[in-house]
Amino acid sequence: MSFGTRLLLFLILTLPLVTSSSPNTLHVSGIVKTGTTSRFLMMTIEDYDDPSANTRHDPSVPTNAKADTTP
């Protein structure tokens, strides 16, 4: 392939990539404005209440688990 053919092929393949990754452009009555809209993700890091004791846990009741499981 000649240099001109390779250059043309390169431009054809890279043009969609370059134009799709550019910021959004707004055309208003012949004036070109380039801008991007910002979005903010609001999140709460305080998902849980203050730590407290488990009211359903009673340590005086034995469990079915064995204390020593070594052979």
From Swiss-Prot:
The keyword Secreted applies. It comes from Arabidopsis thaliana. The sulfation and the glycosylation are required for full activity. One of its GO terms (molecular function) is growth factor activity. Its main location: secreted. The modification 4-hydroxyproline is found at P62. The modification Sulfotyrosine is found at Y48. InterPro entries: PSY. It is found in: Secreted. Residues 1-20 form the signal peptide. Disulfide bonds: none annotated. Residues 50-71 are annotated as: Disordered. Belongs to the sulfated-peptide plant hormone family. Glycans are attached at P62. Promotes cellular proliferation and expansion. The keyword Signal applies. This is Protein PSY2. GO terms for cellular component: extracellular region. Residues 61-71 have a biased composition (Polar residues). It comes from the Eukaryota. Keywords: Glycoprotein, Growth factor, Hydroxylation, Secreted, Signal, Sulfation. Residues 21-46, 65-71 form a propeptide.
